[in-house]
């Protein structure tokens, strides 16, 4: 026996609509999360590439050793 009593008119339709909305929101949230994770990974890779390029430029300019020496002095 169902202790909740009789269902209100339109209650099932409202519940179904709410469940559908929740499912849709969950799918959008998962897609957004995946997109953000991908973009963060891409940004991390770009930062690593930038750091490598800056280091290479410093070596080419001959200033890498002088910066290391200054850091050791302080």
Swiss-Prot record:
Entry annotated with the keyword Coiled coil: yes
rRNA-binding as UniProt keyword: no
An example molecular function term from Gene Ontology annotations: transcription corepressor activity
Coiled-coil region list: 12-65
GO biological process: cellular heat acclimation
Superkingdom of source: Eukaryota
Cystine pairings recorded for this chain: none
Keywords linked to the UniProt accession: Coiled coil
Record Pfam families: HSBP1 (PF06825)
Gene Ontology cellular-component annotations: cytosol; nucleus
Family per similarity comment: Belongs to the HSBP1 family.
Name of the protein in question: Heat shock factor-binding protein 1-like protein 1
Organism: Homo sapiens
Lineage: Eukaryota, Metazoa, Chordata, Craniata, Vertebrata
């Amino acid at each position: 026996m169902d202790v909740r009593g009789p269902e209100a008119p339109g209650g099932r339709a409202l519940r179904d609509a709410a469940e559908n909305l929740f499912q849709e929101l969950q799918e959008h949230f998962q897609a957004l999360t995946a997109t953000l994770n991908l973009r963060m990974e891409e940004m991390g890779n770009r930062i690593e590439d930038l750091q490598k390029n800056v280091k290479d430029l410093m070596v080419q300019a001959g200033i890498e050793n002088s910066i290391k020496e200054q850091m050791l002095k302080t």
